């Protein structure tokens, strides 16, 4: 009997326009924080912080390099950059007593927001950092598309269900 326990990320790689970004020390995948507004009044016992269907607050990717690199410099250009983040995730199958891995692939269209070149410290990393705005994100887990968010084209899919399809139709976008 299978009893999968997700454990950890084994390692990851970041690719810019299909080419490996060297020197990345850490990456923070964007959070999905929905836009909300309060609903209150007659017939409601209190306040509900109601999400706006398929709409999200700013989604950002944070990358940290050990030092300033040419790839860091390239990412500061004022244009959309295509990034692919790949991670190998470790799982333990307690039923079979074996380890296995699954691939996490996060595809992003990224626009630079902030960049810090870090600190100059003898014998240590600089901690060069960048934050990028993400208007488009697709997450695949173990080869299956799980989430797609396209803010500019009114697409928000979770496990194949497009929660903005009717909104696009209502706006005469289909």
Residue ranges and their predicted role:
Residues 1-37, 166-174:
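Polar/acidic, low-complexity leader/linker segments enriched in S/T/G and N/D
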Residues 20-24, 39-46, 86-90, 125, ...:
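Eukaryotic N-proximal low-complexity acidic segments or loops
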Residues 25-56:
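A positional/architectural concept
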Residues 42-47, 67, 109-118:
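Short acidic (Asp/Glu) patches
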Residues 48-69, 124-137:
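Oligomerization/assembly interface segments of phage tail-like spikes and tubes
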Residues 53-55, 77, 98-102, 122-126:
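A generic structural micro-feature
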Residues 60-113:
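A contiguous binding-surface segment within folded domains or other stable secondary-structure elements
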Residues 111-174:
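Mixed-charge, glycine-accented linear interaction segment located at domain edges/termini
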């Amino acid at each position: 009997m299978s009893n999968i326990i997700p454990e950890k990320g084994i390692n990851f790689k970041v690719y810019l326009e299909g080419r490996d970004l060297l020197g990345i020390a850490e990456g923070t995948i964007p959070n999905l924080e929905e836009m909300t507004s309060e609903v209150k009044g007659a017939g409601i016992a209190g306040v509900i912080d109601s999400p706006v269907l398929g709409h999200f607050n700013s989604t950002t990717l944070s990358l940290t390099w050990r030092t300033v690199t040419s790839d860091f410099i390239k990412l500061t250009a004022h244009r959309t950059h295509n990034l692919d983040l790949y991670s190998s995730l470790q799982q333990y199958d307690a039923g079979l007593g074996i380890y296995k891995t699954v691939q996490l692939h996060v595809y992003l269209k990224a626009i630079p927001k902030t960049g810090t070149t870090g600190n100059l410290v003898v014998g240590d990393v600089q901690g060069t950092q960048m934050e990028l705005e993400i208007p488009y994100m697709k997450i695949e887990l173990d080869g299956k598309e799980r989430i797609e968010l396209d803010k500019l084209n009114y697409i928000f899919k979770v496990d194949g269900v497009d929660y903005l399809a009717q909104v696009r139709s209502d706006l005469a976008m289909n």
